[in-house]
Amino acid sequence: MELKEQEKFLKIKKEVVKMIENKKEKLKENNIKIDIISDIMNDEENFYILDFESDKGVTRLEITTPHFTPYYYACFNILWLNDDEAYWWLDEENSTVTEILKNLEKSLTYFINS
C-alpha cells in the first residue's frame, strides 16, 4: 500500500470520528445506536466500518484504503425498514478528501433527520 493512500485514509477516518463526535447528541436524541464493526490497520489494507441503527433503518459507513470495490475510499448506504428505496453514496477514484467528507456528512445528516 502506498503511503499516500494510507495518509488519505487516516485523514478521512480522523475527520469522520470528529464528525460523529459532533453529532453524538443528535444521534442520541434520535435513538440511533452506533457499532464499530471493524477498525483494522495493517501493511496491506485499512478498514474502518461503522453501523448505525434506528427504528427506521440501518446504515453502514465504510472507509478503506483503495482495493477492488465499487468505491475507492468511502461508502455510505442506508437500508430503510419500511422498504423504501435504499440510499447509496460511493466516492470515486479522483474524489478529494473534502468532497468525501462533505458527502459523508450529508449522508449521515440525511439518515439522522429521516
Residue spans for each PLM region:
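Ampiphathic alpha-helical segments that act as solvent-exposed interaction surfaces
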Residues: E2-L27, L81-S114
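Amphipathic, interaction-prone secondary-structure segments
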Residues: N31-N77
